[in-house]
Design a protein with these regions (language model features):
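PPIase-associated folding chaperone regions across multiple families
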Residues: 188-195, 213
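Acidic/histidine-enriched alpha-helical segments
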Residues: 1, 44-62, 127, 146-162, ...
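An aromatic/glycine/proline-enriched structural segment found at the starts
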Residues: 82, 86, 90, 119-184
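Non-catalytic, conformational "gating/processing" segments within enzyme and secreted inhibitor domains
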Residues: 54, 69, 104-138
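Histidine-acidic residue clusters that define the catalytic metal-binding segment
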Residues: 18, 34-35, 60, 78-118, ...
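Short amphipathic alpha-helical coupling segments at ligand-binding clamshell hinges
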Residues: 192, 196, 249-252
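M16 family metallopeptidases and their MPP-like homologs
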Residues: 1-38, 69-95, 117-123, 172-184, ...
Length: 268
């Protein structure tokens, strides 16, 4: 805080990232690079630190459990992916989070949080030559670990029929959604599918908005396409008004997605 640095982190299905935001300053950049290089190999993952952070983690768990759309999407994921790890949440089950032994976390850190498994990104008002020299000075001496990273080999089998999941909870929010398996980021179809998700889900010009929201079948509608290391999902969703007809909204949502085969995307 004394240096004006804002630290944060995010976790996704494919990666975890740690980042620092601060005013462009050579001294601060030097300090951050030195710190990041040090904690990449010398972090002390202690039981007391886990205990002190448990309240924060529980709050994140509860926030996720109380997010209707998040809960629905997770149930969809666990239904769509029966074998691949994409069917699990990034934060994990409450019992695992609260009961994980500290030695498991230490082993995970030693296995994955290493320089040969990381990408360093520096953006802002910088001098490239100066920054690269600083990076080489701090990260260059780090030894490549002796361990070999495991290769993930699980491929989700082709889905053999439609799957459906219903989530019932206390509250008055109603959601309908449909998800479709899509190829991995490196596949040539990944970029076109991102465009397709925008054509479907854009507000107010998207097909879902026009067919559902403007027709008063939904209060909101959207779509999202994933860009993942392995095959993911393209999901379309609609928020159904309390006095609306969920079955009609679902039918129209499916119609808009499935008629893409007969009603191609135009330039306008």
């Amino acid at each position: 805080k004394k240096r004006g640095i804002d630290f944060n982190a995010t976790t996704g299905l494919d990666r975890t990232n740690y980042f620092a935001s601060f005013p462009a300053n050579a001294d601060t950049l030097e300090w951050v690079l030195k710190m990041e290089a040090d904690r990449m190999v010398n972090s002390n993952v202690a039981r007391k630190d886990l205990d002190s952070e448990m309240t924060v983690v529980r709050n994140e768990l509860e926030a996720g459990e109380n997010n209707p759309a998040g809960v629905l999407f997770q149930r969809i994921r666990s239904t769509a992916f029966l074998w691949h790890n994409y069917g699990n949440t990034t934060i994990g089950a409450r019992s695992d989070v609260e009961g994980v032994p500290i030695d498991k976390l230490q082993a995970f850190y030693r296995q994955w949080y290493q320089p040969d498994n990381a990408t360093l990104v520096i953006a802002g008002r910088i001098d490239s030559a100066d920054v690269l020299a600083r990076v080489a000075r701090h990260f260059g001496p780090l030894k490549k670990p002796a361990r070999v990273l495991p290769r993930f080999y699980t491929t989700e089998p082709a889905q053999d029929g439609e799957r459906e999941v219903t989530v019932r909870r206390v509250g008055n929010l109603r959601l309908v959604a449909a998800a479709y398996h899509t190829p991995a980021l490196a596949h040539p179809d990944s970029a076109p599918l991102s465009v397709l998700a925008n054509v479907l889900g854009h507000t107010p010009g998207g097909r879902l908005h026009k067919a559902l929201v403007e027709a008063k079948l939904a209060a909101a509608a959207g779509a999202n396409g994933e860009s993942m290391r392995d095959p993911g999902l393209l999901t379309a969703i609609a928020v159904v008004p309390n006095d609306g007809d969920a079955a009609k909204a679902e039918a129209e949502l499916l119609k808009q997605v499935e008629q893409l085969a007969t009603r191609p995307i135009t330039q306008h």
